[in-house]
Amino acid sequence: MIFCLGAYTGAVSDAELRTISVDYTVEFARVLRLSSSPDAAFSFLSGNGADPTGRSRIPFARYKGEAEKTLLEAGFSRVYLFRPAYIYPVESRKEPNFSYRLMRAIYPAFRLLFPNQVIRADDLARAMVDVAIRRTGERGGQVFENRDIRALVEAQPPLRDRAA
C-alpha cells in the first residue's frame, strides 16, 4: 500500500494538520492491517525533517514523525518511510504561498546546486511504486531520505519525453 496524504503547513490549522498527518494515517493503517495479508507492506509519504522522537518544535516534523513511529509499531511486515525535501510539481498549479512560488521559480538552479534537497513529483512517485513492487523479501522498516529517493530513481531506466 502506498499512502500519500498531507496538507500545506499554514493552509490548515494546527489541529487540522495533526488530524490529516497523524489521525487519518493511523486509522487507515489500522484498517488496512486488520484486512490485509500479514505480509502487507506500507509505504508512507512522510517528509524531510520528520521527527519520530516528538521533540521538534515544527508541527509538520513532529506530526509526520509521530505517524512514522506509529506505522513502525503497527505490525506490518515492511514499512517504507519516504522523506522527500522540496517536491517539484511537474504539472501547473496555483502555488499556495510565496515560498512555494519562489521555489518553483528557482528550482532549475536549486536542482543543480542542491540536488539532494529537491525531487520531482513524478520521480518520487516512481521511487515509491518501485519500492512497493520490488522489495518483497525484506522485513522491517526502512527510511528513504531525499538522496536515497534520488538514487532509487537514478537506478531506473529513464523516462522518455520528460521536461526539466
Protein language model features and the residues they cover:
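NAD(P)H-binding glycine-rich loop region in Rossmannoid oxidoreductase-like domains
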Residues: 1-27, 31-34
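A short helix->loop->beta-strand "cap" motif at the edges of active sites that frequently abuts
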Residues: 36-40, 76
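Internal, well-ordered alpha-helical scaffold/interface segments
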Residues: 26-30, 40-43, 65, 69
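SDR active-site strand-loop-helix element
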Residues: 4-5, 42-48, 82-84
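Oxidoreductase cofactor-interface core, primarily capturing Rossmann-like NAD(P)-dependent enzymes
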Residues: 52-159
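Alpha-helix N-cap/loop-to-helix boundary motif
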Residues: 13-24, 51-63
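C-terminal accessory extensions appended to soluble enzyme cores
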Residues: 160-164
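Residue-level signal for alpha-helix termini/capping positions
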Residues: 33-37, 133
